């Protein structure tokens, strides 16, 4: 059955020996009447509709014509490929079977034919000679191939003399067995990807209406590793090996028809539709052999391999059979053209030499490839200091030298210095930042002489090997000579420093470590598509321009004006100040007229990509532009400029109420869960742990700053197991579309949503657990920061200076270049000024009139007592640090950091700076040194200029700190967020009246027990026993620490003391602490409910509350996942109903008392509150 047969191919079972017959390989049916998919391709502004065709045959089964009946049986496998021949049984072995025998046969056949023809014999005699010599040649060639097979088997058996190269037969055996199974799938993927790329390729000429792979198979013989050698004398983190790879066709000369269908050679048929005809080109019997050297640079973190260098030790040996018009009778073998194969080899050597042949290699950065962003591996800083002894060119008309430098990578100029006028010894002291794709491409530095009218002249070049930067990222005072005609013509002094791109690291548990929030890095901006451009115009073509900080950096190609355009144009850039980078997209027609535009801060573009909102609306509603922006932080050393704080638009309050039905990864017990709130993947706040529960109730609010309404905010739940290890329990993305609103003045407004929201936690193992939360948004008052105010003053000064310069210039004498420079400068200043035009300028005294606001903290430097420490910043009653530095490798802090926190009451707020050994240490754990300072004093002393803070403890440290203060538009904040929510509560049990008498004498021996949130089986306060009375008087007091007054409650149990039996309850009540006045003493007359629901009398209590910030965390015990204390926990939301059988409850109204009819507190009372419905008191 030939490949061109119209018979349908069905899924078949592989017939290769050793393959499980149950394994099926999907074969694609031949589809003749399928409707081709049309792909629209834009070429030079012209739209081409190119058909995407389906292949006819894919995989070895379809191409080889394999059917069910062709499956090889055990008898077929035993058939000898060297079948006996008639002459082989008659002639002695010495008369046939070698190469010279075949030559002799051809000579004898030629001589015999000549003699018969010379003596006028008929053609029949020649046919007898042909038959005889043909049989003899066939017998000899079969014997010769048999001897070659025996020799190959002998080579595999005999031990090699040298042992440098090793065989990898185990891998080759594995491939031999499984290649027939996977080859159809591999071929199908290659065909699908190739046909899609061919249908969309703009480089294909227009007259080719369709081009596709019609048949494709790699054959049943897999690629093979012939030899491998590993070098021993390398560094411990470097592996170098030489590998010989080969791919050879299978010899099918001695196989019968059934065996041929099970052993298929590689075959590729490419078809092109030209002028209505399908023209095929076939490539078969592909062979190659290549010696490759691999160099693996290892690292300690996943994926364990940092870079792979690939180098071809020689030009690969390649051979194939290529026929124009395929296998038809009119086919023509392309390689039959004399000299074509040699030309191919020469061209391969020419283009492979500067890329893959020694000493060059192709470097693959594995973390970069896994990130799928296509960003460079890092930033190279070239600090050009000076040059001296530059020798000008002989015979130059200019007598002076105006040198400047260019920096070139891969034949492309990537940076330039300024022109230094009239000096052979220039001093630049200039830093150039360039993007680096790999270390293998050398850096070319050329010095040019600037000429006004003529083209600039090259004076010399330097080629620097960047591989030195891999081991040592910093090279100082490099001195190299410029060469011209291989002679030195000057010396250059410069510094090189490499800053690697920071990629997310994969932890051993599979989670990704979030990227640090840095102000410097690398960005890739891709202008993808334009849609909605319906405006009719006689201008047929459209293009887009990208301006970054008012500088034109990229122009897309011109495309034909349609409703949907595609560009996919990329722009890469080093960003030294992300928060101030402004991008402007301008849409123009072919005449240069502006159609529409859009201005977007870089931060907004990054946020849009993060939340998959890449379509940007253009001005005046003229379409939408799709822009994808990738960002990777790079720790570029820019001094104080590298630390920048971005002004937020407001604070998002996330009140995390509770979680239910959490996953439990702890096999020894229950986890202790907590929740984090993250912005763009960076954690900004967290709750406290709740001990050993799968249904935690937190009732904690977390404020996070948002710099744009497009940022992704998520809640992540974690759990601490018995061993103290953290487990990710899942996360949910908060929907913030309806939270950010603006008024008529284009200012954000307050948003408070009292309705609970519930979301499912999505983890690696699926959906498990829910979280209930509330959202509010408090916008920041638009005021200029200190840095922005200075920049506005500078802009105004430059504007005035530019206006004066324009007034002194004459329009007739001014050059075109000068006009263009002034125009660009005006545009740049206007664009910068527009960024701050809506903000007010307030001095410090005016800012401090606002009691609530966002405190931005920037640590610029400092000295620590020892290396390997962390600096934490705590605020108010937060038990966990709001800002934590990275681990400081040395004592001196050279790279600063910044963060912020929502200050609710500036007059009471306290800030704590602390130095610890543990990154996640809470406020109750050990520290090395710290300083506590009122936040208002911190603002007063560190607002206008940085100040030094001295930290004292076991050792001492110093921090250089500067802060900023941004007021928040909030007339009233929730009570649970104020200082009155925590403090010391003094409880006085005064007396009781009309208690239930349970003794025989009609009296009782009463005493009172107090529980906080019912989290403990033992009371925290118990009064003395009053004998034989129904109206006892105690006047006993107890002071406790309360961390969540609004959401905590007291459970009161009045009992009768029994000396012989167990004590009996004679009355219960629940008192929410939110009903207590935090500013004055509160006296309650609390009705008690008896055991049977009857009136149990009245209890007289007095509460005195002293607000202060408390530590609401406990120290974690070493080596245990539990905590020393389990008494800390919040309860129900005040304001919700507390049901208790026979129990009275104090409601939310101050001084009012209510009764409830039924509940869960009778004999079936639960000792936990995990199942109670919890709501928030605001």
Swiss-Prot record:
A GO CC annotation given for this chain: endoplasmic reticulum
Ranges of Polar residues composition bias in the record: 1-17
Domain C2: residue ranges: 358-481, 504-628, 632-749, 962-1086
Domain SMP-LTD: from-to ranges: 164-367
Keywords from the UniProt entry: Cell membrane, Coiled coil, Endoplasmic reticulum, Lipid transport, Lipid-binding, Membrane, Phosphoprotein, Repeat, Transmembrane, Transmembrane helix, Transport
Cytoplasmic face residues: 1-98, 142-1178
Keyword presence, Phosphoprotein: yes
Region of interest (Disordered), residue spans: 1-27
Matches recorded under PROSITE patterns: C2, SMP
Cross-referenced SUPFAM superfamilies: C2 domain (Calcium/lipid-binding domain, CaLB)
InterPro entries to which the protein is assigned, alphabetical: C2_dom, C2_domain_sf, C2A_Tricalbin, C2B_Tricalbin, C2C_Tricalbin, C2D_Tricalbin, SMP_LBD, TCB1-3_C2
Annotated consequence of substituting residue 1159 to R: In strain: SK1
Outcome, altering residue 528 to G: In strain: SK1
Residue ranges of the TM segments: 99-119, 121-141
Subcellular location: Cell membrane; Endoplasmic reticulum membrane
Chain coiled-coil ranges: 784-821
Residues bearing PTM Phosphoserine: 991
GO biological process, one term: regulation of phosphatidylinositol dephosphorylation
GO molecular function: lipid binding
Origin: domain of life: Eukaryota
Job of this protein: May play a role in membrane trafficking.
Entry text on domains: The SMP-LTD domain is a barrel-like domain that can bind various types of glycerophospholipids in its interior and mediate their transfer between two adjacent bilayers.
Subunit structure: Interacts with TCB1 and TCB3 via its C-terminal domain.
Miscellaneous note of the record: Present with 2630 molecules/cell in log phase SD medium.
Family membership noted in the UniProt record: Belongs to the tricalbin family.
Protein name, as recorded: Tricalbin-2
Organism: Saccharomyces cerevisiae (strain ATCC 204508 / S288c) (Baker's yeast)
Lineage: Eukaryota, Fungi, Dikarya, Ascomycota, Saccharomycotina
Gene behind this protein: TCB2
């Amino acid at each position: 059955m030939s490949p061109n047969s119209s018979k349908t191919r069905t899924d078949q079972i592989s017939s290769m020996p050793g393959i499980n017959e149950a394994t099926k390989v999907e074969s694609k049916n031949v589809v003749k009447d399928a409707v081709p998919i049309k792909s629209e391709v834009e070429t030079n502004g012209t739209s081409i509709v190119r058909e995407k065709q389906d292949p006819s045959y894919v995989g070895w089964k379809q191409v080889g014509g394999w059917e069910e009946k062709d499956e090889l049986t055990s008898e077929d496998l035993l058939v000898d490929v060297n079948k006996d021949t008639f002459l082989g049984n008659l002639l002695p072995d010495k008369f046939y079977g070698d190469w010279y025998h075949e030559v002799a046969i051809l000579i004898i056949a030629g001589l015999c034919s000549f003699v018969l023809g010379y003596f006028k014999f008929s053609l029949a005699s020649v046919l007898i000679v042909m038959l005889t010599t043909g049989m003899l040649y066939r017998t000899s060639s079969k014997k010769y191939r048999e001897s070659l097979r025996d020799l190959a088997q002998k080579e595999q058996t005999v031990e090699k003399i040298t042992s440098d190269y090793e065989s990898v037969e185990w891998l080759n055996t594995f491939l031999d067995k499984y290649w027939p199974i996977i080859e159809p799938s591999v071929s199908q993927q290659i065909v699908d990807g190739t046909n899609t790329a061919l249908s969309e390729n703009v480089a294909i000429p227009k007259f080719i209406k369709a081009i596709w792979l019609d048949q494709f198979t790699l054959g049943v013989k897999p690629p093979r590793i012939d030899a491998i050698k590993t070098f021993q004398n390398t560094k411990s983190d470097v592996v170098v090996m030489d590998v010989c790879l080969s791919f050879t066709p299978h010899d099918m000369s001695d196989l019968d028809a059934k065996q041929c269908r099970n052993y298929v050679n590689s075959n590729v048929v490419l078809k092109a539709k030209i002028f209505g005809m399908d023209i095929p080109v076939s490539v078969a019997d592909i062979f190659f052999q290549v010696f490759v050297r691999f160099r693996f640079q290892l690292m300690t973190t996943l994926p364990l391999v940092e870079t792979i260098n690939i180098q071809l030790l020689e030009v690969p040996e390649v051979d194939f059979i290529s026929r124009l018009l395929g296998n038809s009778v009119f086919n023509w073998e392309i390689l039959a053209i004399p000299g074509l194969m040699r030309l191919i080899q020469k061209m391969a050597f020419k283009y492979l030499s500067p890329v893959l042949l020694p000493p060059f290699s192709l470097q693959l950065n594995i973390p970069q490839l896994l990130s799928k962003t296509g960003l460079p591996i890092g930033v190279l800083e070239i600090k050009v200091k000076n040059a001296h002894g530059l020798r000008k060119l002989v015979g130059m008309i200019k007598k002076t030298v105006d040198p400047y430098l260019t920096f070139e990578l891969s034949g492309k100029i990537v940076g330039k210095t300024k022109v230094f006028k009239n000096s052979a010894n220039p001093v630049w002291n200039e830093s150039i930042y360039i993007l680096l794709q790999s270390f293998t491409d050398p850096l070319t530095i050329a010095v040019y002489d600037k000429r006004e009218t003529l083209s600039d002249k090259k004076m010399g070049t330097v080629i620097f090997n960047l591989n030195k930067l891999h081991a040592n990222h910093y090279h100082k005072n490099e001195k190299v000579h410029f060469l011209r005609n291989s002679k030195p013509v000057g010396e250059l002094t410069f510094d090189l420093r490499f800053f690697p791109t920071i990629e997310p690291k994969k932890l051993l548990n599979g989670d990704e470590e979030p990227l640090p929030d840095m102000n410097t890095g690398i960005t890739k901006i891709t202008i993808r598509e334009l849609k909605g451009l319906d405006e009719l115009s006689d201008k047929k073509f459209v293009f887009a321009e990208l301006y970054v900080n008012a500088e034109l950096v990229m122009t897309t190609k011109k495309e034909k004006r349609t409703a949907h355009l595609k560009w996919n144009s990329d722009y890469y850039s080093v960003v030294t100040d992300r928060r101030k980078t402004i991008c402007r997209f301008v849409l123009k027609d072919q005449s240069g007229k502006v159609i529409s535009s859009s201005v977007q801060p870089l931060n907004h573009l990054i946020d849009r990509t993060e939340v998959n909102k890449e379509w940007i609306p253009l001005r005046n509603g003229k379409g939408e532009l799709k822009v994808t922006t990738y960002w990777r932080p790079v720790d570029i050393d820019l001094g104080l400029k590298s630390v920048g704080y971005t002004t937020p638009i407001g604070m998002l309050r996330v009140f995390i109420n509770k979680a239910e039905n959490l996953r439990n990864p702890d096999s020894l017990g229950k986890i202790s869960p907590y929740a984090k709130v993250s912005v763009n993947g960076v954690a900004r706040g967290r709750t406290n742990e709740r001990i050993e529960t799968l249904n935690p109730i937190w009732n904690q609010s977390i404020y996070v700053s948002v710099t744009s309404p497009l940022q992704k905010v998520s809640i992540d739940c974690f759990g601490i197991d018995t061993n103290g290890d953290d487990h990710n329990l899942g996360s949910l993305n908060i929907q913030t579309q309806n939270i950010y609103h603006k008024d008529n003045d284009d200012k954000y407004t307050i948003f408070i949503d009292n309705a609970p929201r519930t979301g499912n936690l999505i983890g690696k193992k699926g959906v498990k657990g829910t979280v209930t939360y509330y959202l509010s948004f408090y916008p920041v008052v638009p005021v200029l920061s200190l840095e922005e105010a200075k920049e506005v003053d500078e802009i105004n000064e430059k504007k005035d200076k530019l206006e004066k310069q324009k007034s002194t210039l004459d329009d007739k004498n001014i050059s075109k270049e000068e006009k263009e420079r002034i125009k660009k400068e005006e545009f740049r200043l206007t664009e910068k000024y527009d960024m701050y035009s809506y903000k007010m300028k307030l001095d410090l005294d005016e800012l401090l009139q606002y009691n609530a606001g966002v405190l931005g903290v920037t640590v610029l430097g400092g000295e620590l007592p020892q290396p390997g420490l962390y600096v934490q910043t705590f605020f108010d009653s937060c038990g966990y640090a709001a800002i934590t530095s990275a681990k400081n490798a040395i004592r001196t802090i050279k790279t600063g950091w910044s963060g912020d926190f929502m200050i609710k009451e500036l007059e009471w707020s306290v800030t704590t700076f602390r130095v610890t050994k543990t990154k996640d240490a809470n406020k109750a754990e050990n520290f090395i040194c710290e300083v506590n300072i009122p936040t208002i004093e911190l603002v007063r002393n560190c607002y206008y200029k940085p100040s030094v803070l001295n930290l004292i403890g076991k050792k001492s440290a110093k921090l250089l700190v500067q802060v900023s203060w941004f007021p928040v538009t909030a007339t009233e904040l929730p009570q649970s967020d104020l200082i009155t929510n925590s403090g010391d509560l003094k409880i006085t049990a005064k007396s009781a009246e009309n208690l239930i008498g349970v003794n025989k004498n009609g009296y009782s021996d009463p005493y009172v027990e107090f529980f906080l949130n019912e989290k403990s089986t033992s009371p925290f306060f118990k009064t003395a026993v009053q004998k034989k009375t129904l109206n006892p008087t105690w006047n006993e007091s107890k002071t406790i620490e309360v961390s969540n007054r609004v959401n905590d409650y007291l459970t009161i149990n009045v009992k009768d003391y029994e000396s012989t039996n167990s004590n009996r309850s004679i009355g219960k009540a629940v008192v929410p602490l939110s009903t207590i006045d935090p500013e004055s003493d509160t006296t309650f007359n609390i009705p008690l409910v008896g055991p049977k629901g009857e009136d149990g009398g009245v209890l007289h209590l007095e509460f005195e509350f002293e607000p202060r910030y408390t530590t609401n965390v406990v120290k974690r015990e070493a080596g245990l996942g539990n905590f020393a204390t389990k008494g800390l926990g919040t309860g129900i939301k005040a304001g919700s109903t507390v049901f208790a059988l026979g129990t009275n409850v104090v409601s939310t109204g101050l001084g009012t008392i209510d009764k409830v009819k039924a509940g869960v507190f009778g004999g079936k009372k639960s000792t936990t509150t995990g199942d109670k419905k919890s709501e928030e008191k605001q």
